[in-house]
């Protein structure tokens, strides 16, 4: 049995000039995930379920657990003195860690994705993304350090809190998964070099919003539902409503996750920096693809911290199909 800590140290040789800082950073995220796991499991007992009454910068009501997870992860990262600052879906602006100007990494995160599902005991997750800063080491970080395209990511991953808690991450050398053993307090390697199955057969989208979708997406949904034995259609529809949970299932079983633009969200709803980029990085490392319907997600240069984007991620052939439909059936 190999633990996450042992695995990370073992893989340090894959990085030239490795100093151990990235290893320590991933260890800090691991610690934050353990704390969140513990408190999610007793959330109904300690009054951290439900809405907090506050709104985040996007105008969304923050759940108590959103804020809790944000603070715990932030504290775990700051305590190691290896992160110069963070950007979070739950923070209006970047958070600069005083005294950590010497650090060369920044972290972007969605502390608790799908938190509205907590009250009904549905899987939720944590998403994280790691970049090397672009401003000089020794100075405070600025927004410039965070507004980098996804192809500059050093590492990315997620933690899914479900029937078991699992941490999945990549440093650009494959995707690896670790299951948390609460009796030992460690994450143990369960899958190495994960890949999407050759052919996907599941599509994940909130079909309740069908009438609001672009024409190309509507046509693609109909394509998924049509019978065609040569392409193993119809595909199966599965939608949990938690990006981490939907992505994780599709990674294991094969499929595509879709979150297109709508009239009320013309740029899409998912955040480029906190959700799209890390998941796109993982998808490509696992042999999949991620797109906004026209452009590779990892090539998009972000303009603002909380920028949104349409998002299609999963098996490469399925993402290519939806891109084709969007191109062939544009909105008037």
From Swiss-Prot:
Protein keywords: Carbohydrate metabolism, Cytoplasm, Hydrolase, Magnesium, Metal-binding
Pathway(s) this gene product operates in, as recorded in its UniProt entry: Carbohydrate biosynthesis; gluconeogenesis
The protein's required cofactors: Mg(2+)
Main localization (coarse): cytoplasm
Annotated residues for binding of Mg(2+) 2: 110, 113, 275
Enzyme nomenclature, EC number: 3.1.3.11
Pfam families registered for this protein in UniProt: FBPase, FBPase_C
Catalysed reaction equations from the record: beta-D-fructose 1,6-bisphosphate + H2O = beta-D-fructose 6-phosphate + phosphate
Annotated GO MF terms: fructose 1,6-bisphosphate 1-phosphatase activity; magnesium ion binding
Amino-acid positions noted as binding substrate in the UniProt annotation, renumbered to this chain: 113-116, 206, 239, 257-259, 269
Free-text comment on the cofactor: Binds 2 magnesium ions per subunit.
One GO location term (cellular component): cytosol
Broad enzyme group: hydrolase
Any one GO BP annotation for this protein: gluconeogenesis
Subcellular location: Cytoplasm
Residues that bind Mg(2+) 1: 89, 110, 112
Self-association and partners: Homotetramer.
Record PANTHER family: FRUCTOSE-1,6-BISPHOSPHATASE-RELATED, SEDOHEPTULOSE-1,7-BISPHOSPHATASE, CHLOROPLASTIC
Matches recorded under NCBIfam families: PRK09293.1-1 (NF006778)
Family (UniProt): Belongs to the FBPase class 1 family.
Name of the protein this chain belongs to: Fructose-1,6-bisphosphatase class 1
Organism: Escherichia coli O157:H7
């Amino acid at each position: 049995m190999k633990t996450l800590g042992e695995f990370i140290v073992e893989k340090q040789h894959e990085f030239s000039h490795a100093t151990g800082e990235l290893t320590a950073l991933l260890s800090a995220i691991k610690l934050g995930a353990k704390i969140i796991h513990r408190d999610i499991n007793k959330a109904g007992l300690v009054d951290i379920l439900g809405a907090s009454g506050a709104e985040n910068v996007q105008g969304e009501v923050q759940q108590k657990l959103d804020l809790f997870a944000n603070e715990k992860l932030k504290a775990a990262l700051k305590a190691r003195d290896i992160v110069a600052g963070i950007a979070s879906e739950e923070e209006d602006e970047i958070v600069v860690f005083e005294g950590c100007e010497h650090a060369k990494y920044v972290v972007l995160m969605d502390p608790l994705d799908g938190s509205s599902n907590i009250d009904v005991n549905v899987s939720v997750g944590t998403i994280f993304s790691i970049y090397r800063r672009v401003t000089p080491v020794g100075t405070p970080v600025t927004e410039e350090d965070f507004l980098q395209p996804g192809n500059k990511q050093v590492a990315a991953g997620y933690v899914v809190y479900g029937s078991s808690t699992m941490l999945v991450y990549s440093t650009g050398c494959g995707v690896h998964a670790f299951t948390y053993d609460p009796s030992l307090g460690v994450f143990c390697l369960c899958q190495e070099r994960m890949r999407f199955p050759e052919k996907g057969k599941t599509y994940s989208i909130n079909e309740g919003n069908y009438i609001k979708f672009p024409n190309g997406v509507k046509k693609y949904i109909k394509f998924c539902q049509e019978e065609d034995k040569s392409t193993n259609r119809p595909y199966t529809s599965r939608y949990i409503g938690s990006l981490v949970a939907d992505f994780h299932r599709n990674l294991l079983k094969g499929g595509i996750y879709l979150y297109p633009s709508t009239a009320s969200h013309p740029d899409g709803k998912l955040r480029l920096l906190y959700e799209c980029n890390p998941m796109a990085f993982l998808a490509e490392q696992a042999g999949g693809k991620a797109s906004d319907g026209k452009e590779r997600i990892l090539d998009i240069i972000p303009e603002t911290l909380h920028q949104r984007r349409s998002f299609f991620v999963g098996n490469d052939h399925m993402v290519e199909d939806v891109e084709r439909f969007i191109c062939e059936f544009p909105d008037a």
